[in-house]
Amino acid sequence: MAGNKKTNRREEILQALAQMLESTQGSQRITTAKLAAQVGVSEAALYRHFPSKARMFEGLIEFIEDSISTRINRILDDEKDTMNRLRMVLQLILVFAERNPGLTRIMTGHALMFEQDRLQSRINQLFERIETQLRQVLRERKLREGKGFPVDESVLAAQLLGQVEGSLNRYVRSNFKYKPTENFDHYWQLLSAQLG
């Protein structure tokens, strides 16, 4: 029973941190004092559940990694058409960000500017893994469908992910006014026509 309560409190702390990142406070540095006040506990109580604020951010980063990576792997296992795979992976990231605005501040690095470098490195690694997966999907098209792309797969993967990252940055910059999925269908039609 005590272990369950501790898990619930940990989740409560992470949810409070995500909510703070989603609010106007998210554009400023979040201190443990502010977070403790949000949760309704002392700072000491926060540290009973997490040894540092960096570990709290790591908890949110793990959630982001697990959520996105698991779903990408499912898409790649279930879908075989290259263009559908690409569309679904890109749309997944955009929808995840739109549904989790506070976590989008972490994904763009805005919430990590005043935190430990290793946190930003971890987010960078997540996006590098996604880019690698996109590049692999693009390369597999020759094997699966017998045709390639007019542009090098590495360049194309970087451009695809860059478009997504730009949409996430715009979402954060606009204080969550401009949804990342806004106009995605038009963007995808344009891209599909170019890539054929």
Curated annotation (Swiss-Prot):
SUPFAM superfamilies: Homeodomain-like, Tetracyclin repressor-like, C-terminal domain. Residues 7-68 form the HTH tetR-type domain. The lineage of its organism: Bacteria, Pseudomonadati, Pseudomonadota, Gammaproteobacteria, Vibrionales. GO terms for biological process: cell division; negative regulation of division septum assembly. One of its GO terms (molecular function) is DNA-binding transcription factor activity. Required for nucleoid occlusion (NO) phenomenon, which prevents Z-ring formation and cell division over the nucleoid. Acts as a DNA-associated cell division inhibitor that binds simultaneously chromosomal DNA and FtsZ, and disrupts the assembly of FtsZ polymers. SlmA-DNA-binding sequences (SBS) are dispersed on non-Ter regions of the chromosome, preventing FtsZ polymerization at these regions. One of its GO terms (cellular component) is bacterial nucleoid. Homodimer. Interacts with FtsZ. InterPro entries: DNA-bd_HTH_TetR-type_CS (IPR023772), Homeodomain-like_sf (IPR009057), HTH-type_TetR-like_transc_reg (IPR050109), HTH_TetR (IPR001647), NO_SlmA (IPR023769), SlmA-like_C (IPR054580), Tet_transcr_reg_TetR-rel_C_sf (IPR036271). It comes from Photobacterium profundum (strain SS9). Keywords: Cell cycle, Cell division, Coiled coil, Cytoplasm, DNA-binding. This is Nucleoid occlusion factor SlmA. Gene3D superfamilies: Tetracycline Repressor, domain 2. Belongs to the nucleoid occlusion factor SlmA family. It is found in: Cytoplasm, Nucleoid.
